[in-house]
Amino acid sequence: MRVPAILVVLALWLSVADGIRERDFRVPRFASLTIGRLHYDGGGDWYAGPSALPNLLAALRQRTALPVAERERVVTLTGPELWDVPYLFMTGHGNVRFSDDEVKQLRRWLEQGGFLHADDDYGMDKSFRREIARVFPDHPMVEVPLSHPIYHLVYDFPRGIPKIHEHDGLPAQGFGIFLGNRLVVYYSYQTDLGDGWEDPEVHHDPPELHEAALRMGVNLFTYAVSATR
């Protein structure tokens, strides 16, 4: 674990918070450091894995100096609570659908500092790709290079995102959308990363997989709160 990196991230976040107070309304004002769970329409189980985010937040409190809340917040794309979180998580096994207004609001939030992590729980791939292409038709998803900070910021993942659950023999992949040099959307695919955050007895994961999933989550969150400009 790179302890100095955590201190750098905290300093960066504090400088961002100071800057937010000095800037205009277009800069998102993150009220607290927590994770927003996206309540989306379309029929998919957006609520899947109820123990996942509390466990990740607990790991962040234990392993970093970041002032992280104990619980996630359920948010919608058109509600004011979206602007209170720096990191938005979405998962599920079914269909995802955004309204035209939700598409506009999500793009605006991401352009102004937000970070979306979509975790395909083996079922939402087709609909997520369709909907995120509506949000950024001019910025297609690309595979995130292994040199990117999300794989090295706190813990090293030289081979990229870890494979947590095996379903069809395909490798785990991390895709993303960049605005300039900033990664604003991260899509964990063919891995079940969020399932790895859940209580180990839920999926009977071995300790090393649970730990790998939490470590990757720590990297993602610390990147999200340190790359808001």
Residue ranges of predicted features:
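Bacterial N-terminal signal peptides
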Residues: P4-S15
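Aromatic-Pro/Gly-enriched surface loop or interdomain linker
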Residues: V16-Y87, T91-G94, D192-L193, D199-R229
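Loop/turn elements at helix/coil->beta-strand transitions in domains of secreted/extracellular proteins
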Residues: A31-L33, W83-Y87, Q112-F115, H139, ...
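Short alpha-beta junction capping motif
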Residues: I35, Y87-K126
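An acidic, glycine-rich "communication" segment
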Residues: G43, D125-E201, P207-V218
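Extracytoplasmic/secreted envelope proteins and their assembly/folding machinery
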Residues: P50-L57, V103, R107, D125, ...
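Surface-exposed patches in mature extracellular/periplasmic domains of secreted proteins
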Residues: L66-T76, A118-D121, H139-S147
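Alpha-helical scaffolding within the catalytic cores
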Residues: R71-L77, S99-Q105, G169-Q173
